[in-house]
Regions:
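N-terminal alpha-helical interaction modules that lie
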Residues: 1-56, 174-190
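Tetratricopeptide repeat
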Residues: 24-25, 62, 69, 97, ...
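Hydrophobic/aromatic packing residues within the alpha-helices of TPR/SEL1-like helical repeat arrays
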Residues: 27-31, 65, 100, 135
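Alpha-helical adaptor scaffolds
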Residues: 41-117
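Boundary/linker segments of alpha-helical solenoid repeat arrays
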Residues: 73-78, 107-115, 140-154, 183-188
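TPR/TPR-like (Sel1-like) alpha-helical repeat modules
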Residues: 105-108, 124-146, 159, 174-180
Length: 190
C-alpha cells in the first residue's frame, strides 16, 4: 500500500541529494503498484511526474501526468497544470495553452490553489496579463470561501504582476497593505 509518508521521504531524500531522477524512477514504479486503501494511483503518478520535471525530463513527466489524468483518482492538485508545465518545457506550446483553456472552461477559476498554480505557470511563460487574470480570479474565489492561506499567496503574486505590468495600486493591493499593517501592529485594522 502506498502512503504519502513514503513519497514524502523519497522527495526529501531527492531534495537532499539532488537525485530527482532516482526518485522519479522509484515513484513511477510504485505508482503502478498502487492499491486501494493508500495514496491514490493518480496522486502517485502526479508526484512521480513532479520529480521527472525536477530531473529535467519533461517527456517522462508528461507520461506520468497523463497517467494521473487517465486514472481519474483524487489528487492534491489538478494534473492538467503540471502537464501544461511539462508541455511548455517540451516546446509543445499549443498543447500547453489548450490545457490552460480547458482549465478555464472547466471551472478552475473558482479553485484558489489551481488559480495560483496557473498564474505562476503563466508568469514563467511571460504571459503576465493572463497570469494576472488567474491570480485575480483566485483572490475572488478565496474571498468567497475560507482559504486565507492561499489568499495571502495570491495577493502577493497579484501585486508582483501588477508592479511588473506598471499598473497602479488597486483595492486588492490595499488588502495586502492592510495585512502587512496588521502583522506590524495587531491592533491595526480592527
Amino acid at each position: 500500500m502506498l502512503s504519502s509518508e513514503l513519497f514524502d521521504a523519497i522527495e526529501v531524500n531527492a531534495a537532499r541529494t539532488g537525485n530527482h531522477k532516482r526518485a522519479a524512477v522509484r515513484m513511477s514504479r510504485l505508482a503502478v503498484q498502487a492499491s486501494q486503501g493508500g495514496m491514490s494511483r493518480a496522486e502517485a503518478h502526479m508526484r512521480a511526474g513532479e520529480q521527472w520535471l525536477l530531473a529535467d525530463d519533461p517527456e517522462e513527466a508528461v507520461e506520468q501526468f497523463q497517467k494521473a489524468m487517465a486514472d481519474a483518482g483524487p489528487t492534491f492538485d489538478d494534473p492538467r497544470v503540471p502537464l501544461a508545465r511539462a508541455m511548455f518545457a517540451l516546446g509543445r506550446t499549443d498543447d500547453a495553452e489548450a490545457l490552460v483553456r480547458e482549465l478555464r472552461e472547466s471551472g478552475a477559476l473558482t479553485q484558489p490553489r489551481t488559480c495560483d498554480l496557473v498564474a505562476e505557470l503563466l508568469t514563467e511563460q511571460g504571459d503576465l496579463r493572463t497570469a494576472l487574470d488567474w491570480a485575480t480570479a483566485g483572490v475572488e474565489a478565496c474571498l468567497r470561501g475560507e482559504d486565507r492561506d492561499e489568499l495571502k499567496l495570491l495577493l502577493r503574486l497579484r501585486y508582483r504582476l501588477r508592479v511588473d505590468l506598471g499598473l497602479p495600486e488597486d483595492d486588492y493591493d490595499k488588502m495586502l497593505d492592510n495585512k502587512k499593517a496588521q502583522r506590524a501592529d495587531p491592533a491595526a485594522g480592527k
